[in-house]
Amino acid sequence: MRRTPAAERLSELGFPPRRGSQEPPFPLGVTRGWGGWPIEKRCEGPRPVPFSERSAEDGREQPAHGSGILWRVRTRLSLCRDPEPPPPPPPLCLLRVSLLCALRAGGRGSRWSEDSARLLLLPPAGASGSLKAERSSSTPYAGRMLESSGCKALKEGVLEKRSDGLLQLWKKKCCILTEEGLLLIPPKQVQHQQQQQQQQQPGQGTAEPSQPSGPAVTSLEPPAKLKELHFSNMKTVDCVERKGKYMYFTVVMAEGKEIDFRCPQDQGWNAEITLQMVQYKNRQAILAVKSTRQKQQHLVQQQPPQTQQIQPQPQQPQIQPQPQPQIQPQPQPQPQPQPQPQQQPQPQQLHSYPHPHPHLYPHPHPHAHSHPHPHPHPHPHQLQHAHQPLHSQPQGHRLLRSTSNSA
């Protein structure tokens, strides 16, 4: 079977004959696409005649064009079909045909074919712009996680932490400063969480409104490598140095552990961490003082009923000694028939005793209960009996003299 030359096939397709070293404007012999769809060709020169309006001799009678014409071919599918409509093609056929034609139309080293193939594989410009807008508008993963737990992110950024290994390399950490501490998250983990969010967002838009609650809860799961430096365990922020474009500082924990950080000088992470730590300590001290005061007030409110029960107890012994002076005045008439001893206290007043005053006036003395007579009158009589052994001899002579005189 003899193969028809390329010039005849080009004339059948409606293109002028080839002259010189000009490349064919379109792959030879391609008249129909995948599934029997007719393919039309366009060029910058005269428009080719459709198949329905073309005769067998039209290709030979067409005028020739100059060799300087540059052909730019683009494939497209016609809107009308043949009288015998073929079955509908699968969805991937359009991409296959357009990609094949774009790669073969411009020749082996054509830049246009590469660009067209690249454009076919890339998403449309509107989709990429919408993704960028979603990324800029959407809050980061860690910030949304903190908001769900009730904390507020005061500052977010990247800090470099010195590793604990032998090499002590600087590793970047995504840091979030809150009112209660500093959160450290590996940057790879944050990127992974953001990718999961972007994958879940288009699924949520097509799903029913009742279904997105499930992925939203799962996306807020805490990361596995999250490290928190709480202000309650933090002691100081020390060793602040500026070298080059970095600022170096050390966070000293309560257990004695030291963690080295560095950041650009214009960010001022050390000042922010110190300020929030001092404010946290002040809040805790105020809460401690308030709690102690509330405990004291609570104890004071419970004490008054107990004091009322204790007060009636000392009143009872005060009532008991009162009937004693009422019963004991009976022996008072006994010293009355002795008039002589009552006249003799005058010479006894000449003697100076070290403590005569406590017995002259009645007052609640601690040894008042030891005396059987709390009344003020029997005190002179008691003084006589108390000092009788000291002056027994002169009193005895006086008594004898008085008896002799009376006799």
Swiss-Prot record:
Residues 189-204, 297-319, 385-395 have a biased composition (Low complexity). Induction: Induced by FGF in a hippocampal progenitor cell line. Induced by FGF and EGF in a CNS neuronal cell line. Keywords: Apoptosis, Cytoplasm, Cytoplasmic vesicle, Nucleus, Repeat. SUPFAM superfamilies: PH domain-like (SSF50729). The gene is Phlda1. This is Pleckstrin homology-like domain family A member 1. Seems to be involved in regulation of apoptosis. May be involved in detachment-mediated programmed cell death. May mediate apoptosis during neuronal development. May be involved in regulation of anti-apoptotic effects of IGF1. May be involved in translational regulation. Its main location: cytoplasm. Residues 320-344 have a biased composition (Pro residues). Residues 1-11, 54-63 have a biased composition (Basic and acidic residues). It comes from Rattus norvegicus (Rat). Residues 354-381 are annotated as: 11 X 2 AA repeats of P-H. It is found in: Cytoplasm; Cytoplasmic vesicle; Nucleus, Nucleolus.
